[in-house]
Amino acid sequence: MSRIGNKPVEIPSGVTVTVNGADVTVKGPKGELKRTFNPEIVVKVEDNTVVVERPSDKKEHRALHGTTRSLISNMVEGVSKGFEKSLELVGVGYRAQKSGQKLVLNVGYSHPVEIVPEKGIEIEVPSNTKVTVKGIDKERVGAVASNIRSVRLPEPYKGKGIRYEGEYVRRKEGKTGK
């Protein structure tokens, strides 16, 4: 990870990065993100870039170096562009619809499944078989999308279920009768 850690993070116009000890705050047109990093890793703002430095070449410092740089890069990208994850529902009668802020999924259970998005996460339903999760925090967008997918995981025999857009579902042969 040390090669990634050595790359500086470019700060686009309209985005400000503030470092206060181990706390890094990133403000942009879409919102504000704050995160506390390991105090051993040094984060500096120089000109229009964020530079991450490690104290030594120990294995744990090398790993934290790259991780910290990637997390800061995702924070900068999130407040400037935002993140989006798309899911598709595959199966006869599988539908998604929005009811206020809640997402209501009809995916073959005896009852509709309701999902309430957490603060800062927006769920859109462009069609009744597509769901889009949007937000500025990459980690939370992925977690909400994963929770929606876990309601009905894609099964290998008919491919029914909720899957990420473009996800390949490995199919299996059914049993052959005698």
Curated annotation (Swiss-Prot):
Pfam families: Ribosomal_L6 (PF00347)
Keywords from the UniProt entry: Ribonucleoprotein, Ribosomal protein, RNA-binding, rRNA-binding
GO cellular component terms given for this protein: cytosolic large ribosomal subunit
Gene3D superfamilies: Ribosomal protein L6, alpha-beta domain (3.90.930.12)
Top-level taxon of origin: Bacteria
Subunit and partners: Part of the 50S ribosomal subunit.
Similarity annotation: Belongs to the universal ribosomal protein uL6 family.
Function: This protein binds to the 23S rRNA, and is important in its secondary structure. It is located near the subunit interface in the base of the L7/L12 stalk, and near the tRNA binding site of the peptidyltransferase center.
Name used for this protein in its record: Large ribosomal subunit protein uL6
Organism this protein belongs to: Halalkalibacterium halodurans (strain ATCC BAA-125 / DSM 18197 / FERM 7344 / JCM 9153 / C-125)
